[in-house]
């Protein structure tokens, strides 16, 4: 069986490699993507990118395609799946005064909407989006935990699941 290495570039912090077979990628595209978008879906899986391919024009389609691709790609390893709806938790990084370019939030959103990257790889990359201590990652995990318990964080105030001092400007010594 031939394997296709998939390199997922994580900004300037390096990359990670995951192995999916060409056959599995093709099978997932055939099962989950419309015929006219299968090549685009294959590209999504090969390069670990978010769902696009025109599916974003309908608010429900990306979720269906994402879930289907995850189910096919990680059918034998359910722990590698991650809930697309948890991407709303990336908002915890949005007001970080230490990240004016919103790099952590953007990385989080891209990774959380990329169906071919396994959960552990995504979470490790989100956690390490800053070379310094990423205190907001704890809030991100708390948000995911609350969502798993059925609580929609969209109706919560930030302070209800995260310490507001985490977003305040911090001084760094020796950096």
UniProtKB/Swiss-Prot annotation:
Residues 1-18 form the signal peptide. GO terms for cellular component: extracellular region. Coiled coil: none annotated. This is Protein her-1. Keywords: Developmental protein, Glycoprotein, Secreted, Signal. It holds the Pfam family Caenor_Her-1. It is found in: Secreted. One of its GO terms (biological process) is male sex determination. Its main location: secreted. Dictates male development. Probably plays a direct role in cell signaling during C.elegans sex determination. Inhibits the function of tra-2a. One of its GO terms (molecular function) is signaling receptor binding. Glycans are attached at residues 98, 163.
